């Protein structure tokens, strides 16, 4: 069995173990601090007991002698001292327990310190191992740098996309009409991005699963290779033992053969000596030798031949054994080379396995980083979608608000059209009635003179009452404008004021909506709109002043007409009933009738203006105080109640005016009765005069 290489622990595992140990140490420190902190003192209850028992002693001491009171005080003092002693004993015991706990905690802290020291030693070992793996990490750093560059490029692309999305959001905020289409496009793009992200996630999950499967396959193959290596090593060890035994046997046989060879060589040498001696003897002069000697010589020669043959056989055996030994040595060398090659292959496989594991770890880290980036991108897209949805809701609310405003404007226009139709009908009716009256006046000129005198009086009364109403309306407009300015300065928001309208038809709607209270500030309005509305306030003030001046001109015109009527009356009285001037007088009468119609229309408009002012304006009390002074004191030239008509006729006229004009606000329905408001009473008093004329 070859020794397996020591693999270092993963740095992430080391960091996790370190963090876990630090968290455990922090928890122990917190527990130690909590135990060390002093608890609630037990003397509070005793103090309460003292306070509870003190009134009893005082009450009981009121009826006894001073000696008893001193005795009781001493008893109380003894009780309090005993209680304090008990408390001190309890505190001592608690301090002892705390001391034990502190000692126990110190022991635990020592243990934790030892564990930390061991962990530090392990970390030092891992650092040494990591220094050995520095060469491999350089290659991984190169790959990580390339990946970081790639991620930087992707981050730049994402930053550009974010800028583009911000520009799109600004465009959405600017234009309401283009928001819907752009929003649909962005929804489509976001859905496409989500689909792409989901595909990427699925691909990464699949790749991760494939990598895990590949890792499992590699680990299984490594296990199989290790098993095969172990089996092959066992087989090689067995063969080595066999070859060693055979080599030992062969070496033993070679030694025995060498010894036999030496013996044979020694015998051969002895035989050669003996042969040489015999040859020498044979070389001597022949003598009669016995046959025994010849036979001995022949035997010796045969033995020598036999020995030579044995020596030759032994030499062949030796050569064959040497050749076998050489072949065995070659085989052993080849087997050693094979074993070395296999060991190198196994080492290379182990190194490849380590590299593959490192590469898989790097790939897993990259996949985790990609998943994190994808999750961050998804969160960003979700946040963008939420922002866009909020903006859509705001835009929808603004659209709804604009639609409501449009509906209100349409309703106001419809009301104005209805008013115009009603006024036209009233004008037609008045024209018909005036034509009938003119016919009667032509038939009876004397009655016409009396009527003209009455009209003159009524015109003077109208002038005075119109002036008073004009002053009151001016005060009302100024108060309303000042209140509106104060509210706008405090709130710094947009006040929804009605438009100027087209011509004289929309003046009534402007004057009706002018004194209404300011609406609540909408939350969706931007600061630019608020500042622009605040800068437009002087323009609105100027428009209000122009409207007041127009009304003043409208009220000044009937006064001029009455002056003309007076002049015509003086001329008529000076000339008398001349037939040539009758035609001019009739023309003057017609003109007066037209001016009276205009006065009636303006009075109706004033009535429509005053009713919402009285009902909805916040400074109604000031208006009543300013209006009750002329109501209590009769003005010079004002007609008596008998001349103006009965109260029933006034009520009838009030009901007709409300039916024919705009419906009053709920505040006007509560507070706008003609008997409670002096300006309304004056307008109602003017109405029967106009009916009489």
From Swiss-Prot:
Q: Which GO terms describe its cellular component?
A: cis-Golgi network; Golgi cis cisterna; Golgi cisterna membrane
* InterPro entries the record matches: GOLGA_cons_dom (IPR043976), Golgin_A (IPR024858)
Keyword Coiled coil on entry: yes
Q: Which family does the similarity line name?
A: Belongs to the GOLGA6 family.
- The name of this protein is Golgin subfamily A member 6C
What's a Pfam family this protein contains?
GOLGA2L5
Ranges of Basic and acidic residues compositional bias?
A: 537-547
Q: Which GO terms describe its biological process?
A: Golgi organization
Q: Coiled-coil region(s) at which residues?
A: 73-611
Q: What is the lineage of its organism?
A: Eukaryota, Metazoa, Chordata, Craniata, Vertebrata
User: Would I find Disulfide bond among this entry's keywords?
Assistant: no
Q: Which UniProt keywords apply?
A: Coiled coil
Q: Where is this region: Disordered?
A: 20-71, 497-547, 629-693
């Amino acid at each position: 069995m070859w020794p397996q290489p020591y693999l270092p622990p993963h740095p992430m595992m080391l960091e996790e173990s370190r963090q876990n140990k630090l968290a455990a140490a922090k928890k122990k420190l917190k527990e130690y601090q909590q135990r060390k902190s002093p608890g609630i003192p037990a003397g509070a209850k005793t103090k309460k007991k003292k306070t509870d028992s003190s009134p009893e002693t005082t009450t009981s001491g009121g009826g006894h002698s001073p000696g008893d009171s001193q005795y009781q005080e001493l008893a109380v003092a003894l009780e309090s001292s005993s209680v304090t002693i008990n408390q001190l004993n309890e505190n001592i015991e608690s301090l002892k327990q705390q001391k034990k706990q502190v000692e126990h905690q110190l022991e635990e802290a020592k243990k934790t310190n030892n564990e930390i020291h061991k962990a530090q030693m392990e970390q030092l070992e891992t650092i040494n191992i990591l220094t050995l793996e520095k060469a491999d990490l350089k290659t991984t750093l190169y790959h990580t740098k390339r990946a970081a560059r790639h991620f930087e490029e992707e981050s730049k692309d994402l930053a550009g996309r974010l800028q583009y999305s911000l520009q799109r959001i600004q465009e959405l905020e600017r234009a309401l009409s283009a928001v819907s289409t752009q929003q649909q496009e962005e929804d489509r793009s976001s859905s496409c991005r989500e689909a792409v992200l989901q595909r990427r996630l699925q691909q990464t999950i699949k790749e991760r699963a494939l990598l895990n499967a590949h890792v499992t396959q590699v680990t299984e193959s490594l296990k199989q290779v290790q098993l095969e290596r172990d089996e092959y090593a066992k087989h090689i060890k067995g063969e080595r033992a066999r070859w060693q035994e055979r080599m030992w046997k062969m070496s033993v046989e070679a030694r025995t053969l060498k010894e036999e060879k030496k013996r044979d060589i020694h015998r051969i040498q002895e035989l050669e000596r003996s042969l040489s001696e015999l040859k020498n003897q044979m070389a001597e002069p022949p003598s009669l030798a016995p046959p025994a000697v010849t036979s001995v010589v022949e035997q010796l020669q045969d033995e020598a031949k036999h020995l030579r043959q044995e020596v030759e056989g032994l030499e062949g055996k030796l050569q064959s054994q040497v050749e076998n030994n050489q072949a065995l040595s070659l085989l052993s060398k080849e087997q050693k080379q094979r074993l070395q090659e296999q060991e190198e292959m196994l080492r290379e496989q182990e190194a490849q396995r380590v590299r593959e594991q490192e590469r898989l770890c790097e790939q897993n880290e990259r996949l985790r980083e990609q998943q994190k980036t994808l999750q961050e991108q998804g969160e960003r897209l979700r946040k963008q979608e939420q922002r866009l949805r909020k903006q859509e809701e705001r835009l929808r609310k603004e659209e709804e608000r604009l639609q409501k405003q449009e509906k209100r404007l349409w309703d106001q226009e419809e009301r104005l059209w209805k008013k115009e139709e009603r006024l036209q009908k009233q004008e037609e009716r008045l024209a018909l009635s005036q034509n009938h009256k003119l016919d009667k006046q032509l038939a009876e000129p004397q009655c016409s003179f009396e009527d003209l005198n009455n009209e003159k009086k009524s015109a003077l009364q109208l002038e005075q009452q119109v002036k008073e109403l004009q002053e009151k309306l001016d005060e009302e407009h100024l108060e309303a404008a000042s209140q509106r300015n104060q509210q706008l300065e405090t709130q710094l928001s947009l006040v929804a004021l009605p438009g100027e309208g087209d011509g004289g038809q929309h003046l009534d709607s402007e004057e009706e909506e002018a004194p209404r209270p300011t609406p609540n500030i909408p939350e969706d309005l931007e600061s630019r709109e608020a500042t622009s509305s605040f800068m437009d306030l002087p323009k609105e003030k100027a428009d209000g002043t122009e409207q007041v001046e127009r009304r003043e001109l409208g009220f000044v015109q009937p006064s001029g007409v009455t002056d003309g009527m007076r002049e015509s009356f003086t001329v008529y009285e000076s000339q008398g009933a001349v037939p040539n001037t009758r035609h001019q007088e009739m023309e003057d009468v017609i003109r007066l009738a037209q001016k009276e119609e205009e006065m009636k229309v303006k009075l109706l408009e004033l009535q429509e203006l005053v009713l919402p002012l009285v009902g909805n304006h916040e400074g109604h009390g000031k208006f009543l105080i300013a209006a009750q002074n002329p109501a209590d004191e009769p003005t010079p030239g004002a007609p008596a109640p008998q001349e103006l008509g009965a109260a029933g006729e006034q009520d009838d006229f009030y009901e007709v005016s409300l039916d024919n004009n705009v419906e009053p606000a709920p505040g006007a329905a509560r507070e706008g009765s003609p008997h409670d408001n002096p300006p309304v009473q004056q307008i109602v008093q003017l109405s029967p005069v106009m009916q009489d004329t």
